[in-house]
Amino acid sequence: MTSDPHGTQGIVSIGSPLPDAAGVLILLHGRGGTAEDILGLGEPIAPEQWAMLAPQASGNSWYPFSFLAPREQNEPYLTSALGRVRAAVDMALAAGIAADKIAIAGFSQGACLATEFVGRNPRRYAALLAFTGGLIGPPGAPIKLTGDLAGTPVLLSSGDPDPHVPWARVQQSADLLQEIGGRVTIRRYPGKPHSVTGEELRSASDVLAVA
């Protein structure tokens, strides 16, 4: 097994060319999804003149087990996945996009990955938009975040109950991100299916409109 299973996968780009972009929206697909799929979710929410970047997971899955499994069970896939998010951020930075004009979004497994990356690499981003996800790690295990999100807008939205993401983890993630300086909004949708709704997209668009 390679130590970097996602390392050879590409990053798909649409929207404004990076050198001309006013900002960048990085989108992370869920288990079984593709970069092309998640870019379709980004199109209704990305501001004009923004670029969109979507890394592709090997085998269409960022890590093999639940985000609530012991972290070691999801290695080396999890570390490799976080590396692909880093690569997308670095692409934007190298093109001259400031970090506070880089937003990171994802759905389900991709939302967990987005939340984990931002929580472990805090700085002022344009936004974190996590549709049905939360910080990664088993229930009951301590999660400690350090650093400063410096007022980064954070939108965490999910159904309750959800078959994969307990609401308690969404709330815990919101609390922890707020403790390190995130400006957190949570949206709880009783009975919502495991999907992204139009209302969630409108909320995300509102966040990015002022990014």
Describe every region a protein language model picked out.
Residues 2-99:
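Serine-hydrolase catalytic machinery in alpha/beta-hydrolase-like enzymes
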Residues 31, 171-211:
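C-terminal catalytic histidine-bearing segment of alpha/beta-hydrolase fold enzymes
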Residues 123-136:
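A conserved short beta-strand
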Residues 38-41, 141-142, 166-176:
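Short alpha-helix in the alpha/beta-hydrolase fold that links the catalytic acid
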Residues 155-158, 162:
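Short beta-strand/loop motif that positions the catalytic acidic residue
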Residues 104-106, 131, 157:
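Short beta-strand immediately N-terminal to the catalytic nucleophile in serine-hydrolase-like folds
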Residues 40, 116-120:
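Active-site signature of alpha/beta-hydrolase-fold catalytic machinery across serine-
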Residues 106-110, 114:
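Gly/Ala-rich beta-loop-alpha elbow adjacent to hydrolase catalytic centers
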